[in-house]
Design a protein with these regions (language model features):
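N-terminal leader/targeting and assembly helices and adjacent pre-domain segments
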Residues: 1-204, 220, 288-291
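Acidic, glycine-rich two-metal-ion catalytic cores of nucleic acid-processing enzymes
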Residues: 198-291
Length: 291
């Protein structure tokens, strides 16, 4: 069986392949005057000079006809690819494939593939939901699933847990993602949101699990153990997509912050944290310390 990190790596590679397959069709879509106008307004003027999202005012300019046209075309394109892209993950681990199967618009692909900052993604999701209910929970599902996958990848590096515990940890991660959604929608500062999620996850980290150890083909069940881990977020560092497309500047920032993580109180999108440019292919990972 492949490790979760292998599957995560394969997922990003397949998503990159999906993007390459979509590019010719995206070019055709954006050649349409209505679509081109939508993309131009949404991405070129989404942020003001202070980094504040201006989707609310911009999206009011775009009528329901445009929204429906986009949704219908993107639904057709993405349904063709969704099953193949996630077949390997679906077959190996009990991930929440419902979120992946909701890939019904190009923006959702960008959300899971190039997610840079959870706070920004959730703010975008809230504003899109307000104006285009036809897209409903897509971005929310992407953020929640992504948060769960990140928590799983951390566990897989540190511990030799079995798949059933992966599933428990993913469930906790998805629940934490939903809680983070509420924190961000209440405009809670990112530091407080992180503290809130940390406290929430501390409760989830008390786990009673039957450890199964495989030795020379024999299955041995150990005694039930109680494990309590209390952590707090101390800092963060930038992580980029490993597919050869990340720019040199982002790679340099990633290397620098890997060696010297940034204190959480210095979190500043565009300065110390992604996005560093409009199509930034980075996100952040938290550094946790045991209390």
């Amino acid at each position: 069986m492949k490790s979760f990190l292998d599957l995560e790596r394969a997922l990003f590679e397949q998503l990159a392949d999906m993007e390459n397959k979509l590019l010719p069709k995206l070019t055709e879509l954006r050649a349409d005057p209505i679509i081109a106008s939508f993309v131009h307004e949404l991405y070129s003027y989404a942020m003001d000079k202070d980094g504040n999202v201006k989707y609310s005012r911009l999206l009011q300019k775009i009528d329901r006809t445009t929204a429906n046209a986009l949704q219908n075309m993107q639904q057709e394109l993405l349904e063709e690819l969704a099953d193949d892209v996630y077949a390997e993950v679906r077959g190996e681990y009990p991930l929440s494939v419902t979120a992946f199967d909701q890939l019904n618009r190009i923006d959702a692909v960008k959300a899971i593939y190039g997610m840079t900052d959870l706070k920004m993604a959730m703010r975008e999701a809230k504003l899109i939901r307000e104006h285009f209910d036809v897209w409903a929970d897509t971005v929310f599902a992407m953020v929640e699933t992504f948060y769960g996958i990140k928590s799983l990848s951390k566990i897989s590096v540190q511990h030799n847990f079995e798949p059933q515990l992966y599933h428990q940890r993913l469930t906790a991660g998805l629940e934490a993602g939903k809680r983070l959604s509420l924190d961000v929608l209440r405009a809670m500062p990112v530091e407080r949101a992180v503290e809130d999620i940390t406290r929430y996850m501390e409760k989830k980290d008390k786990q009673v699990t039957d450890r199964i150890v495989f030795t020379e083909g024999t299955t041995v069940t150990e005694e039930v153990s109680v494990e309590v881990v209390k952590t707090r977020v101390k800092a963060f560092h930038t992580v980029s997509v490993k597919d050869g497309k990340t720019c040199a500047d982002c790679k340099a920032i990633e290397a620098e912050q890997a060696a010297n993580p940034v204190p959480i109180e210095n979190y500043a999108p565009g300065v110390t944290a992604p996005p560093f440019h409009p199509y930034c292919r980075c996100w952040i990972d938290f550094v946790e310390v045991v209390r």
